[in-house]
Curated annotation (Swiss-Prot):
GO molecular function: ATP binding; ATP hydrolysis activity; helicase activity; RNA binding; RNA helicase activity
Compositionally biased residues, Acidic residues: 224-251, 292-308, 673-683
EC number: 3.6.4.13
Recorded family membership: Belongs to the DEAD box helicase family. DEAH subfamily.
Catalytic reaction list: ATP + H2O = ADP + phosphate + H(+)
Protein name in the entry: Putative ATP-dependent RNA helicase PB1A10.06c
Record keywords: ATP-binding, Helicase, Hydrolase, Nucleotide-binding, Nucleus, RNA-binding
Subcellular localization, as worded in the UniProt entry: Nucleus, Nucleolus
Enzyme class: hydrolase
Domain Helicase C-terminal as annotated: residue spans: 611-831
Taxonomic lineage from the root: Eukaryota, Fungi, Dikarya, Ascomycota, Taphrinomycotina
Biased composition (Low complexity): 165-176, 184-196
Region listing for Disordered, in residue ranges: 1-92, 165-315, 673-696
Any one of the GO BP annotations: maturation of SSU-rRNA from tricistronic rRNA transcript (SSU-rRNA, 5.8S rRNA, LSU-rRNA)
Amino acid sequence: MGRLRKRFNEKGRQSGIQKMLNLKRARLHRSVREQESSSEVHANPEPDNQDSNAEILIDVPKEERQKRKQELKDQLLKENEGSISSKKKKRLDKYIENKLKKEEVASLIAKLAEERIDTSLLSSSKNLGKQATAKEKLKKSLLEEKLGLPLSDADSRLYKVVDVETTTTKSSTAETNAPEKYSTRSGFGFGFSTGTNESEITPNIKVLPPKKKKNASWGKMLNEDPEYDSAEEDYLSTDSEEFSEDSDNSSEENKDTNEPSTKDAEKTVPEDVVNLRSEQKLQPSFGHPEFENEDFDLETSEDDSSDDATERASRFKSWANKQILGADVGEKSHDVAPDNKIDNPDADMVRAQRMPRKLKMREEDVEPTADDIEIKGRKTTYTIINRPPEIQESRLALPIVAEEQRIMEQIFANDVVIICGATGSGKTTQLPQFLFEAGFSSPESENPGMIAITQPRRVAAVSIAKRVSEELTGFSSKVSYQIRFDSTINPDTAIKFMTDGILLRELSSDFLLTAYSAVIVDEAHERSVNTDILLGLLSRIVRLRREMSKSDQKVKPLKLIIMSATLRVTDFSENKLLFSVPPPIIKIDARQYPVSIHFNRTTKPDYLQDAFDKVCLIHKRLPAGSILVFLTGQQEVEQLCQMLRKRFVRSFRPLKSRARIVVSRKTMSVENEDLQSETEDIDQVPTSSSSSVTYDDESEPMYVLPLYSLLTTEDQMKVFDSSPEGHRMCIVATNVAETSITIPNIRYVVDCGKAKERVYNEKTSVQKFEVRWISKANADQRAGRAGRTGPGHCYRLYSSAVFDSSFPLHSLPEILRTPVESIVLQMKNMNIDNIANFPFPTSPGRSRLEKSLKLLSNLGAIDSEGVLTKLGEQMSLFPLSPRFSKMLIIGQQHGCLPYVIALVSALSINQLFVSKQSLLYDAHDKNSRSEETDLIDDDEIKQKEEYKNRMRGYFNAISRFQAIDPDAPALSLLSAVCAYDYASDKRKFCKENYLREKALEEVTNLRKQIIGLLKRYMVRVEKEFFKLQLKPPTSVQIKALRQFIASAYIDQVALYDKEKRGYVTLFPSGSEVVQFVPDRTYNIDSEYVVYLSLHESRSGRVYMSPLTEISPEHLARLAKNTTLLSYSKPLSYPPIRYLDNATKRECWVIPILSANIGTGSPSWNLPAVQIIQKRINGRWVNC
């Protein structure tokens, strides 16, 4: 019989019909609607048990609702006797309906409150996708078993399957012949009676192998108790199953007896042991409340109640806790062998047949010790060092010395180890000594190579090497250092400190680092580019050395130790590309005194003025101690130094003899409470502008020193000297004082919370300096400077809310902020073809790598397939930018090599001239004023006149150096370097010509280094080219130098636009036009200009630093064979001339210079040139 087929869109028609019926019903009178509704209720009575899953639910309590409504209405009418108007009746009906609704809601809530759902088997949504542990799976299975539900985990085993051959003979034999010397620990409360025949115990029992225990506390308890034998317990637990059938009745009688009789013990003990063993297997942890009251007895007896198992479990738990705590149980054991072993040999055979289970601790809970680390065949070699007592005492005060044993064990057991220790823990100076004393670098040991320690800064490498050589008394000749311009390496060197760039250079010649047995990478948390590349290479070298040592005994494994001052090591330890197995991490506590952190209530925009006010209050109110102020740049440092000197330095004003009482700061308390009370209103002090700063003759004098990277070495070393007597030292520094340098006696730190960073836009190649918030890790580093010698205080010039919301946790790695073409060239030289797959700790991104490869292709270092060319191989020999390396290689023409060396060195160092801002601060210095302004009495007028004179001399000096070629500003640097070499008094020469003496010293050192490299790799170079004092270049040499510069910067070309009155760059710069840097005057009238770099100012305008002008003909010749230059079709005139039977042709074409990056890049037509083309496979190709 067929079914009634549903019509199309039946539900839609039903809804439409229902709407029509509702509208029709709404037009009826209310009394008629009420009659119809009541008739419907009577016609369709609702059953008591209504299906809640039905599609339509009919309202059941309508009759009750009407009845209740009528009762309320009668009650209210009775209370309000008299006539009620129709309006009040309507309001009364509405009131009754609202009241009924409230009563229904209240009853519904009461019903819901009575209904409860068991949520024990429910899980939180946040744990979705998370794999449950064995303990959680067992707990869930037990609950499902208790509730009578099917087990969700099919692998869960709640019961132990035992096959027992129950024969009367074996049962009676087991009862009468129980082992005499088989006894358990006194904490169990069980004993065995003596038997006569022990050889008849041959039970036929199949026992499933138990699962491994995962309870660490149980394993620790067993390890702490030397008398406990886990195999004996397993033996007793398996024997007890033979007596399970005969022990049902006796268990009830003896459950409360700790020392039962011999007869009862024969029946009771095995059952108790089985119950306890079953409970032990089912309980994830002994103290869990959900399992303590459960009955997990696996015996077949039905008379044993859950109370017995609970009582026995509690007794076992109390014994286990007492054993863990080492307490005396109070019960004496009976018949326990002294060595806790079974004397019967037959019983030993039984035990071996039953394969007792041995309990082990989890690997993650075991802390490796010297006994746990297995080092096979290691030859022990050590070096004894006799240090003076004062050095030994200072070493013992360092936290890392206490961890020497643990550190060396991990180094011997692992090839890679990470050590985290805050600044001041002693890891940099002590770890090389640990390795040296343990036999590293000794020819007789298994690690005969040197110990290499890399530092990101040259100053740190030199200073640490000197410190380690002082501590290694008698072995000071074993410690050496090698930096860019200096080296003390000798044949006896065993510990070598160097910059990370030096080690990278050594990798290009010796990739396996066969001369080293251990490499220590220090300051890895700074994430410099060289450090990241070095770690990526070392991760592969360590693996290669380990594999090669297995087949060749001459090759020894390499040990890599990564040291970080912060806990930011997840980029190394959790990076599977670097280390497939995470290396162990050792954390060392720092020798740090407590530092109190004080935030501002509000963050003031003028942090320079706020820093001045803070320093003034600290100097006036707080006890003795040096002050360290962190600012963003040289300009702010000099300005604050000027304000503080004007306020507290007496040389600015004549001293006034005035009797006053001064409390010595040495006698003042340094307690935190006193300090808080003194600085309580520190944010409410009114600020004063720098122009209104006056000398304070009531305060003690202050010794103010600046510290930034552009200072001379002599001026930088002043911060390590002691201040004059009666003066408080105040050091105003940039972030150079944040790491590497430890300034003594710093008690107070004033932190502005900002730093000036160079931001590089990889799309536009525009650089700009931005003042940004530092990271939280850097803020902690700055605060830690105040806790080196004693309790200190750090005053942060920002609020805690800004610190929490605006400060990043860590700063970006340097590899994400700088160009990487130099690193890519070095990796190409190491035969690393696929650089994208290199194990960077933080990948720079595929786009940046492709951009660097394109630049190397334009420079001719690699071909179109990415293979290193001969020119690229020569460029990789120099520790310079690829642009400068190319200048050195092609600059051997016309005798220009000496000038190219000097020019490359000057461009590498850059900033040979002082900045215009420093001229303003020199004008305020009384010692640097000229004789012309001495006759002026007014200080402000005197400062303005002095500034004008200095600006006039500044531009005159630049004009003198540019006289060699006004169209090539880069040659002014060459002129300054050559003039410096001829100066007898170099300091006076730099001061008169507004040059930075420190920069020129670095240029001289770099020239010497480049000359040394050229002597090593280029034997054809004449000796005359290596002189430092050079004669002025000829006109031909000047033209050649300009082309050398343009060849190295062929992609950084700008064309002058007359309509826009500015230059347009070849690659988009983000600005329509760019202008010259306004620091100097340029006399360039050429159409095409090659520039050094682009800079964005605070106003958003883009400026360029020009190098030289270039003609379009030279530009077309230099851009040949690059992706920047293409040619048009042959011109019709002059006509084409065919050669060699029409296989070649000579024609004129228009060169087109473009960036070839798609839409938006300009293309410039250069003057037509004549070229020769050859026909290959039907196409004309340029020869």
